[in-house]
Regions:
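Positively charged n-region of N-terminal signal peptides that target proteins for export
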Residues: 1-4
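Short, low-complexity, Pro/Ser/Thr/Gly-rich segments in the mature regions of secreted, periplasmic
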Residues: 138-152
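Electrostatic cytochrome c docking/interface patches
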Residues: 15-34, 44-51, 57, 152
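Bacterial N-terminal signal peptides
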Residues: 6-16
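Generic structural signal for secondary-structure transition and capping sites
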Residues: 69, 104-108, 140-143
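Axial heme c-ligation environment in periplasmic c-type cytochrome domains
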Residues: 48-52, 73-92, 101-128
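C-type cytochrome heme c attachment motif
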Residues: 32-43, 59-63, 95-101, 118-121, ...
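N-terminal, post-signal-peptide region of Sec/Tat-exported proteins
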Residues: 48-73
Length: 152
């Protein structure tokens, strides 16, 4: 009986940890979803090779995962995203998926500032984990990075 109890208890603690470490999205599905992002964003590698042709309203999303928020040189970011980056926000798949769902709400929560705003008004309601996984796949600097610690 003790063995059964111990096994059930161990599983109760293991399942949530396993779910968290394996809850990343599907990069192939995210690449398809990225079509919604192309109106404003492109993905162009450091050598100038175009991975995804897109708009220039938003910053280039190459190597986004693992990068400090609001830090692409020569891009005019909004004040709140720059403040979040200066406060320690480094994009990982989890934070990026949360941001994509509601950028302004994410910044308000992250900065604990009800007046914080994102210049990105688009909200991706479904597939945020997939898009985050796709962006991680075009972020060579993020290899081995699953989830960055939350800044406090």
């Amino acid at each position: 009986m003790k063995l059964i109890y111990s096994t059930v208890l161990a599983m109760a603690f293991a399942v949530p940890a396993f779910a968290d470490s394996h809850s990343m999205g599907d990069a192939d599905a995210g690449e398809k979803q990225f079509g919604k992002c192309k109106a404003c964003h492109a993905i162009v590698d450091d050598a100038g090779e175009v991975i995804q042709r897109g708009g220039k309203v938003g910053p280039n999303l190459y190597n986004l995962v693992g990068r400090q928020a609001g830090s692409v040189e020569d891009f005019k970011y909004g004040k709140s995203i720059v403040e979040a980056g200066e406060g320690g926000l480094v994009w990982d798949q989890a934070s990026l998926a949360e941001y994509l769902e509601d950028p302004t709400d994410f910044l308000r929560t992250t900065l604990d500032d009800s007046k914080a705003r994102s210049k990105m008004s688009f909200k991706l309601r479904k597939g945020t984990e997939d898009v985050a996984a796709y962006l991680a796949s075009v972020s060579p600097g993020a290899e081995g990075m699953e989830e960055a610690p939350k800044s406090e």
